[in-house]
Amino acid sequence: MSTEGGGRRCQAQVSRRISFSASHRLYSKFLSDEENLKLFGKCNNPNGHGHNYKVVVTVHGEIDPATGMVMNLADLKKYMEEAIMQPLDHKNLDMDVPYFADVVSTTENVAVYIWDNLQKVLPVGVLYKVKVYETDNNIVVYKGE
């Protein structure tokens, strides 16, 4: 099917991956020390532990006929640097990121935090999905729902 002169509007998704390192401790102030230890196990260590997180951010939208892009990947890289790397890389999530003062720093909540931060800097309506790899086997996908 030809797109020349047909006015066809094509939608696409574009993803970019980054990595950051951070430490945290899984602990809920709503649970006793015994309940925290039972629920979170070794991840409840009072000294915390760290991860090398991988994050895949997916945006979606119409492919611009003039540029051939949904979004310039250089721009997406800048947005991700501002919304993810600056606040999270080489940080203790529980101590250095105010959001986690009252929110348990599970990977689910890290994904929500990243989504919310990206929503502040990205053009309206383009963010589609945030995928956070805590490890190669532990992955959370969040779509703002």
UniProtKB/Swiss-Prot annotation:
It comes from the Eukaryota. SUPFAM superfamilies: Tetrahydrobiopterin biosynthesis enzymes-like. Pathway: Cofactor biosynthesis; tetrahydrobiopterin biosynthesis; tetrahydrobiopterin from 7,8-dihydroneopterin triphosphate: step 1/3. The active site is at 43 (proton acceptor), 90 (charge relay system), 134 (charge relay system). Transmembrane segments: none annotated. The active site is at the interface between 2 subunits. The proton acceptor Cys is on one subunit, and the charge relay system is on the other subunit. Belongs to the PTPS family. NCBIfam families: 6PTHBS. It is linked to Hyperphenylalaninemia, BH4-deficient, A: An autosomal recessive disorder characterized by hyperphenylalaninemia, depletion of the neurotransmitters dopamine and serotonin, and progressive cognitive and motor deficits. Neurological symptoms are unresponsive to the classic phenylalanine-low diet. This is 6-pyruvoyl tetrahydrobiopterin synthase. The gene is PTS.
